[in-house]
Amino acid sequence: MNFFFKLTKLFYSLIIIFFITFFLSLVLDYFFGKKILELTDNYWKKTEFYGRILRIDHPVYHHGLKENVVLKNSKGFDGLFTFCTDNHGFKNECNQIIDKDFEIGFMGDSFTEGASVKYEDSFVGLYKKASNKDVANLGVVSYSPKIYLSKINYLLSQGYTFKHIVVFIDISDLYDDSFYYSLNTNLEVGENSRRGEKLKLRRILRNNFPFTNFYMFVLKKLNTKSEEQKIKSLTPSFHDEAMKKAIWTYTDPKNINGYYGSIEDNQKSMIQIIEKLYFLLKENNIEMSLAVYPWPQQIENDIVNSKHVEMWSKFCEGRCKHFFNFFPYFFDSKEKYGYLETYKKYYWWDDIHFNKDGNKVIANELVKVLK
């Protein structure tokens, strides 16, 4: 009985010590967390975990990339690669200090950022090398039309200049724009819906307890890494979230489970946002072009004249300098070689993003047209 009492007392003492330690670490993090990360910045740059630190919040257009990053251990689908940003926080070649005047700005999400390849292998980097033009890669993971508009408006207000903006409209833009983001009258991007509430909590953690947020990410990353399977299946396996975001272009229902609002209303909302972007660019004597491209799910399940293609080709009539439609290229490949061979040639396995060959397809067309 005495032994049990002592054991119980020890247990409660350990719990109290744990919570006191945790509380003190949060207090320390609240006041000194940012400074701790700054002091250890050079160490984290040598690890794959720095990918968390280089993606930062923005008070106007929601999120972006940290300036002057040189991350040599960024994890890609075919090994590690070097991820760099310039002095503006745009993905670029390493150690670039450039001014605010650009001939062409490319806007989009992770496809445009080239999140899974080094800059030189992304379609923006390939185009820049071939054309020798002053190019800005404005794209970042998880961007969508509300952020496209907000960020470009912000950059123009900060003295950036462009002659031409090319917007790559992603398949996921309809879902992301309606489900994740809100836009106020000042063109500032906020968060929307239940998912938005989770993002708000995450942002509070990042802003107030940055070091705690970071080491939680490291622990999660290490756990995920230990669970990775190296054996490939004969057919690709996509994340449920990707399947959900892709389905709207090749299904009939006006309302899809898991979506925020009807497909038709979300299409109209996206068009209104891009129309505002068009008028903003026109007021500043900047030409606009749009580009559309398929995800693997579109190649497998959709038609070449997809809803996605139709809505944006119609929008571009009388507005866009160019309308880049990459659906025919990939559907022609499907016709010749089949879906699976087309997928393996142009996309990363078990993922929706273009591999190096897929990026070359996009870049080659840009080089032909944007001279």
What are these regions (language model features)?
Residues N132-D134, Y160-I165, K282-S289, R319-H322:
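Loop/turn elements at helix/coil->beta-strand transitions in domains of secreted/extracellular proteins
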Residues K35-A130, A242-P253, F330-K334, G338-W349:
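Membrane/wall-proximal cationic-aromatic binding patches
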Residues I171-S313, F326-Y337, K345:
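Serine-dependent acyl-ester chemistry module
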Residues P145, L149, Q267, I271, ...:
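Short, amphipathic alpha-helical "lid/cap" segments that border enzyme active or binding sites
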Residues E113-R195:
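Conserved SGNH/GDSL esterase-like catalytic core that processes O-acyl groups on lipids
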